[in-house]
Regions:
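Short loop-beta-helix segment that forms the pyridoxal 5′-phosphate
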Residues: 165-171
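Conserved "HGTGT" condensation-loop signature of ketosynthase/thiolase-family condensing enzymes
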Residues: 1-119, 124-164, 185-188
Length: 195
């Protein structure tokens, strides 16, 4: 059976936004859970969440988002992003750099990408609020596209020019495990060289 190696890591999490921060948080038992203001309302039974302080993505307009300056996202791309796509984009940039993969390797038909996402309920909620307040004609035509589970995969594929196998997996809390396992199988079965 073909051996498979993890050669690049990237993180955007509530316990750190790079491998050094995540390792430090794990070693020092820091959890990353906070009480965000948006949950501090009587009707919300949930009062805590994992927050990512380096990113300010409250605006419904992605062009107003604030995130670490080392991540470059072309305007044409970010307009179709939901917050989870930006998090994935930034962590993927770290992983690509960590693995020392160049853009030509990514465009090789033997390079694929499998992602895990349930979509963006936040984006759906914001778009429905806008539609309810201003009418359907005021809605962004990309509203649904930027909210569905597949948006993560097709945004990353298009942005990086990936021509190999691509798929978005949605299976609740098992989604990431399924994406990793399926990507592992693609390499072991000789269908892809890198995922």
């Amino acid at each position: 059976m073909t051996e498979v190696w993890v050669t690049g890591l990237g993180f955007v999490t509530s316990i750190g936004c790079d491998s050094a921060q995540v390792e430090d948080s794990l070693l020092n038992l820091r959890h990353g859970i906070a009480c965000p203001n948006m949950l501090q309302v009587p009707e919300s039974p949930v009062k805590v969440a994992g927050t990512i302080d380096e990113f300010e993505l409250d605006s419904s307009d992605p062009e107003d988002w604030k995130f670490p300056s080392e991540y470059k996202v072309p305007r044409s791309l970010i307009r179709s992003f939901s917050p989870h796509v930006l998090y994935a984009w930034c962590s993927l940039q770290q992983a690509i750099k960590d693995a020392n993969i160049d853009s030509q390797d990514l465009k090789d038909p033997e390079s694929g990408i499998y992602t895990a996402s349930g979509g963006s309920m936040r984006s759906i909620h914001k778009h429905f609020e806008k539609m309810d307040r201003n009418g359907v004609m005021a809605c962004n035509p990309l509203a649904i596209v930027s909210s569905i589970p597949g948006t993560l995969t097709f945004n990353l594929v298009a942005a990086l020019g990936i021509r190999g196998s691509s798929m978005g997996l949605v299976s609740a809390c098992a989604s990431s495990g399924h994406a990793l396992g399926t990507a592992l199988d693609e390499i072991r079965l000789g269908r892809q060289k890198r995922m």
